[in-house]
Amino acid sequence: MNLIAAAIAIGLSALGAGIGNGLIVSRTVEGVARQPEARGQLMGIMFIGIGLVEALPIIGVVIAFMSL
């Protein structure tokens, strides 16, 4: 039962991160299309956002392995 719970936790955290990263990148592309001169600033903010979104699945994996 613990293995199933760990697999579900890892899968859902990866799914959430994928959706979050897709939304962040799509909004950044829209912003660059509207204001090309703000590309550098938008890319920096995008990378910070992606880093924060990717931290959650890593924490989820660690918690899943700790529960085994």
From Swiss-Prot:
CDD domains per the UniProt record, alphabetical: ATP-synt_Fo_c_ATPE
Residues passing through the membrane, by range: 4-24, 45-65
GO molecular function: lipid binding; proton-transporting ATP synthase activity, rotational mechanism
This protein's record includes keyword Cell membrane: yes
Name of a matching Pfam family: ATP-synt_C
Gene that encodes the chain: atpE
InterPro entries: ATP_synth_csu_bac/chlpt, ATP_synth_F0_csu, ATP_synth_F0_csu_DDCD_BS, ATP_synth_F0_csu_sf, ATPase_proteolipid_c-like_dom, F/V-ATP_Csub_sf
Localization annotation: Cell membrane
Protein name per UniProt: ATP synthase subunit c
UniProt-listed HAMAP family: ATP_synth_c_bact
Record-linked PROSITE patterns: ATPASE_C
Keyword Cytoplasm on entry: no
Site features described as Reversibly protonated during proton transport, chain residue numbers: 54
Family statement drawn from the similarity comment of this UniProt entry: Belongs to the ATPase C chain family.
Stretches assigned to coiled coil: none
Functional summary from the UniProt entry: F(1)F(0) ATP synthase produces ATP from ADP in the presence of a proton or sodium gradient. F-type ATPases consist of two structural domains, F(1) containing the extramembraneous catalytic core and F(0) containing the membrane proton channel, linked together by a central stalk and a peripheral stalk. During catalysis, ATP synthesis in the catalytic domain of F(1) is coupled via a rotary mechanism of the central stalk subunits to proton translocation.
Keywords noted in UniProt: ATP synthesis, Cell membrane, CF(0), Hydrogen ion transport, Ion transport, Lipid-binding, Membrane, Transmembrane, Transmembrane helix, Transport
Main location as per UniProt: membrane
Record text on subunit structure and interactions: F-type ATPases have 2 components, F(1) - the catalytic core - and F(0) - the membrane proton channel. F(1) has five subunits: alpha(3), beta(3), gamma(1), delta(1), epsilon(1). F(0) has three main subunits: a(1), b(2) and c(10-14). The alpha and beta chains form an alternating ring which encloses part of the gamma chain. F(1) is attached to F(0) by a central stalk formed by the gamma and epsilon chains, while a peripheral stalk is formed by the delta and b chains.
Topological type in the membrane: Multi-pass membrane protein
GO CC, one annotated term: proton-transporting ATP synthase complex
